[in-house]
Amino acid sequence: MKAGIHPDYAEITATCTCGNVIKINSTVGKDLHLDVCGACHPFYTGTQKVMDTGGRIDKFNKRFGALGKK
């Protein structure tokens, strides 16, 4: 490998919204904030829940909710 052309590889912290903290190695260089992780993802936990990111469902229903009603 050539010297001086590869990015730095360091340990960073990935923090999920559920509070789970994961230490990983990455070239990103800064801490990550995750929406879902293996501890809270519905596929891994076996639970189903609606994940409304930023009120998108409410915004959609407000714009197009009247079209479904006759």
Swiss-Prot record:
Signal peptide: none
Binding site for Zn(2+): C16, C18, C37, C40
Cofactor: record remark: Binds 1 zinc ion per subunit.
Cofactor(s) needed for function: Zn(2+)
GO cellular component terms given for this protein: ribonucleoprotein complex; ribosome
Keywords: Metal-binding, Ribonucleoprotein, Ribosomal protein, RNA-binding, rRNA-binding, Zinc
Pfam families noted in UniProt: Ribosomal_L31
GO terms of molecular function: metal ion binding; rRNA binding; structural constituent of ribosome
A single GO BP: translation
Alphabetized PROSITE patterns for the sequence: RIBOSOMAL_L31 (PS01143)
Known function: Binds the 23S rRNA.
Sequence similarity: Belongs to the bacterial ribosomal protein bL31 family. Type A subfamily.
Quaternary data: Part of the 50S ribosomal subunit.
PANTHER family: 50S RIBOSOMAL PROTEIN L31, CHLOROPLASTIC, LARGE RIBOSOMAL SUBUNIT PROTEIN BL31A
Protein name: Large ribosomal subunit protein bL31
Natural source organism: Shewanella pealeana (strain ATCC 700345 / ANG-SQ1)
